A protein has these predicted regions:
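Phosphate-binding/catalytic loop of phosphoryl-transfer enzymes
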Residues: 1-18, 169-172
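Short glycine/serine- and small hydrophobic-enriched flexible loop segments
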Residues: 4, 53, 142-147
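Flexible, glycine/charged-enriched surface loops at secondary-structure junctions
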Residues: 11-13, 61-69, 127-130, 153-156
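A contiguous, well-structured pocket-lining segment that forms one wall/lid of small-molecule binding clefts
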Residues: 17-98, 107-121, 148-151, 168-173
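Active-site metal-binding loops of divalent metal-dependent hydrolases
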Residues: 102-104, 130
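Conserved phosphate-binding/catalytic loops in two-lobed NTP-binding clefts
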Residues: 115-140
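A polyampholytic, Gly/Pro-enriched intrinsically disordered region
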Residues: 145-157
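A short, charged, Gly/Pro-tolerant segment at domain boundaries
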Residues: 155-173
């Protein structure tokens, strides 16, 4: 939604990231998500609303919106919300491996911040190649389509519980 406000094409993740790279940011002060009593929870609705309101206010008062700076400050606000929570989750669980995936893992600011935070914490970070960091829903749907074509159809008793531990996947590499 932030990409749409900035006039970027859909899907907006990659265009927003490219636009953000054109600025050092620090121009717009955007809110960070905070949920009292739930240090791992987050919501980006306030951030989205802030971007929309900022863009509309800037237009209403006749000022020019620095689209690149807003893209950068938005991406940094997402990263500043996400990365500390990921690190806190590692701390709470005692784990030393973090994996990021999906569209959010394609963002260069988030990737860089995760790399620095994991290096500082002495944990391993797994990031898929950028070409594999797309919309997870689309990937799951595409795989489901090919499974269906191959005749692999599950009945209604199928659940979403993992049947293989991530450690097995990590050790397979």
């Amino acid at each position: 939604k932030a990409a749409r406000v900035l006039g970027l094409p859909y899907p907006g993740g990659a265009p927003l990231d490219r636009l953000a790279q054109q600025s050092q940011g620090g121009v717009y002060r955007l809110p960070l998500s905070h949920v009292d009593g739930a240090p791992l929870d987050m919501s980006f609705s306030g951030l989205k609303t802030a971007v929309v309101n900022l863009a509309h206010h800037t237009q209403q008062v006749g000022e020019e919106l620095d689209r690149a700076a807003l893209a950068r400050d938005f991406a940094q606000a997402v990263s500043d919300t996400l990365v500390p929570r990921a690190m806190e989750a590692l701390r709470q669980t005692g784990r030393k491996v973090l994996c990021a995936a999906g569209g959010v893992a394609a963002n260069s600011i988030i990737r860089g911040d995760l790399e620095r935070a994991c290096a500082k914490a002495g944990c391993r970070l797994y990031l898929p190649p950028l070409r594999l960091c797309g919309d997870n829903g689309a990937m799951i749907g595409a795989q489901g389509y090919y499974e269906y074509l191959a005749g692999h159809v599950a009945d209604m008793s199928l659940n979403a519980y993992a049947t293989r531990a991530i450690e097995a996947e990590i050790n397979a590499d």
